[in-house]
């Protein structure tokens, strides 16, 4: 028999949101947080929802992906976004918060809720099968619990480091310069290729070597063996003038028919590029493209500057920059349903960064959905998934859809993803102007979510509780 009391493990953004949604649906919650009795290398307090990196939730304008995600969360009265709005600080067009007041307010809100029981200890194992549980332990999940999650999901389904190449929008690439081809013409032309001559390559390599690095935290530096197994592109460049050319930038076997006869040796030697950067589809439609082999520890501003030196990428727009850091996350497409339930245990949910989403608002969105569904399950009702036309729905669909991991990609190549318009379904009518297209995405999302919200057998009217807190 299922215990109707929901357990939420982790009181970060996702866990805090999940606990709030469950409790406000009238279902009792036990919220487990190990801090401050056991901290992480990145946290400094025992407050809930402590922001350890930036204090920004991203752009406010709903014509931007991050802004639309925030707008959708406001529709569902997200605790995280309402608290962020309450303690916002001036940040131009972004939503940034006073970190201390933000986390203290979250802690007070959750601690004073009559249906939320707070327990401070390190969860060492997954709760028993009869317990409805939301796993929201984040990228710095404790070692002991990580081992138990790994045992439950399978050794290849739980990752402990994030080595991700940049992802760029396909429509920002110069199609006059790049060309489609697979190496040695094997199969369909699965890659877009950016050819470099010798001068391009030498200049590019020099800039990579001189580029400013992001600072690794001490606990990340201790994991040097990881970086040896998956070297940053700038480290490959340092190892020799031609090292990249015989690695991720090798040009052999790639040919553009515009260059003439491949089998004419003289022509081939004359026209063959000195090096080639390859771009691979990140989604089935090819709206998002991954820079193959470009995991990097360069600062984001440097990535933008240096990678735009690649022919064809002069005006590239980045969905996500490359990262190399400690990050516990699941191989979610092989584990989770669009409801955020585990396929092999339907009363166990996952939410937040551990599912492979990136960003504060995305973590809150995962907590929102997991909380709604855990409360529905506790009441004996059917769980739900958000419409794909919404930013929340498209992001959750990406991390829970096996088809998003393309057949031409190697096993376990799923990488965390932020909110992006590249994830949402195409409009029925094509709109060339980007601003108008993004506005249309926003309008479609709002309509779909309002309809979805009206149909949900769930109470969202909680203003009386918020007013007591603030």
UniProtKB/Swiss-Prot annotation:
Cited Pfam families: GIDA
Entry keyword set: Cytoplasm, FAD, Flavoprotein, Methyltransferase, NAD, NADP, Transferase, tRNA processing
Uppermost EC category: transferase
GO function terms (MF aspect): flavin adenine dinucleotide binding; tRNA (uracil(54)-C5)-methyltransferase activity, 5,10-methylenetetrahydrofolate-dependent
InterPro entries given in the database record: FAD/NAD-bd_sf (IPR036188), MnmG-rel (IPR002218), MnmG-rel_CS (IPR020595), MnmG_N (IPR040131), TrmFO (IPR004417)
Top-level lineage group: Bacteria
Enzyme Commission (EC) number: 2.1.1.74
Record field: catalytic activity: uridine(54) in tRNA + (6R)-5,10-methylene-5,6,7,8-tetrahydrofolate + NADH + H(+) = 5-methyluridine(54) in tRNA + (6S)-5,6,7,8-tetrahydrofolate + NAD(+); uridine(54) in tRNA + (6R)-5,10-methylene-5,6,7,8-tetrahydrofolate + NADPH + H(+) = 5-methyluridine(54) in tRNA + (6S)-5,6,7,8-tetrahydrofolate + NADP(+)
GO cellular component, one term: cytosol
Amino-acid positions noted as binding FAD in the UniProt annotation, renumbered to this chain: 10-15
A GO biological-process term: tRNA methylation
Required co-factors: FAD
Cell compartment(s), UniProt: Cytoplasm
UniProt xrefs under PANTHER family: GLUCOSE INHIBITED DIVISION PROTEIN A, METHYLENETETRAHYDROFOLATE--TRNA-(URACIL-5-)-METHYLTRANSFERASE TRMFO
Family recorded in the similarity comment: Belongs to the MnmG family. TrmFO subfamily.
Reported function: Catalyzes the folate-dependent formation of 5-methyl-uridine at position 54 (M-5-U54) in all tRNAs.
Protein's name according to its UniProt entry: Methylenetetrahydrofolate--tRNA-(uracil-5-)-methyltransferase TrmFO
Organism of this sequence: Prochlorococcus marinus (strain MIT 9215)
Taxon lineage: Bacteria, Bacillati, Cyanobacteriota, Cyanophyceae, Synechococcales
